[in-house]
């Protein structure tokens, strides 16, 4: 192919030959026809790599700021409490990687081994990978277009040496973007268990979650369920509950009923969650009996039950 624009969407992109940057490119017709696209060998390589990963869970949200990364981190912490369970946490929020901070791993670097990139470990059974580990400073801005993000996700899925893993948790950016399309495409043949969608109770968040649910259905991504985060505040002294974000349209419960998706649970606001995330520590350690911790544990149990059922169905399909 001839010289292409710097901001080319890529011959394999859905926007190939159709995007604004394609105007005037000598390869526009070729890309629009699909003739410029070539089979991506990485899909088979990733499928092979993922054979050592038992369960794969995507964590999604319609909006930023609803606690998606906090949930991903505490899902990983909760599952890793069983020392015999191996957990991998992959942060593909390329432009806003917050997992290194939440997991207490800021300043850590990625190391190369003979079998690929080595994850950074919080515990012996909890490994983490994030683009944040590749930045010289946490304040560095990542200003990448779709093809470069796609390449980074491909490299994470293909080249990170997780070893034998029970749960791979993928923390995604908010919304439905290139990153979501890439990870679903690359893991399509590796059998994703499903997605957990995080929301807050108010309608301004729920309206984007409806779009997220429609996205999952369009790309045939199973929905494990919805978590309503910041669902009320329980006063630690009087135990009275206050609605900080009022569910003016019925909250996640009514939305889940209307769209026929499971509501996994509600996590109340707790100031300790934010404090512990800033310190890079698990909230469960400091507040083992708080309403938020108990809600998390119930949700984690339901996710495990879903994954075990999904695994049984996969095994039955293979045996038949």
Curated annotation (Swiss-Prot):
One of its GO terms (cellular component) is cilium. It comes from the Eukaryota. PROSITE patterns: MRP. [4Fe-4S] cluster 1 binds at residues 8, 22, 25, 31. GO terms for biological process: cell projection organization; centrosome localization; intracellular iron ion homeostasis; iron-sulfur cluster assembly; negative regulation of centrosome duplication; protein localization to cell cortex; regulation of cell growth. Its cofactor is [4Fe-4S] cluster. The modification N-acetylmethionine is found at residue 1. SUPFAM superfamilies: P-loop containing nucleoside triphosphate hydrolases (SSF52540). ATP binds at residues 62-69. The modification Phosphoserine is found at residue 319. InterPro entries: AAA+_ATPase, Mrp-like_CS, Mrp/NBP35_ATP-bd, NUBP1/Nbp35, P-loop_NTPase, YlxH/NBP35. It is found in: Cytoplasm; Nucleus; Cell projection; Cytoplasm, Cytoskeleton, Cilium axoneme. [4Fe-4S] cluster 2 binds at residues 235, 238. GO terms for molecular function: 4 iron, 4 sulfur cluster binding; ATP binding; ATP hydrolysis activity; ATP-dependent FeS chaperone activity; iron-sulfur cluster binding; metal ion binding; nucleotide binding. Pfam families: ParA (PF10609). Keywords: 4Fe-4S, Acetylation, ATP-binding, Cell projection, Cilium, Cilium biogenesis/degradation, Cytoplasm, Cytoskeleton, Iron, Iron-sulfur, Metal-binding, Nucleotide-binding, Nucleus, Phosphoprotein. Component of the cytosolic iron-sulfur (Fe/S) protein assembly (CIA) machinery. Required for maturation of extramitochondrial Fe-S proteins. The NUBP1-NUBP2 heterotetramer forms a Fe-S scaffold complex, mediating the de novo assembly of an Fe-S cluster and its transfer to target apoproteins. Implicated in the regulation of centrosome duplication. Negatively regulates cilium formation and structure. This is Cytosolic Fe-S cluster assembly factor NUBP1. It comes from Homo sapiens (Human).
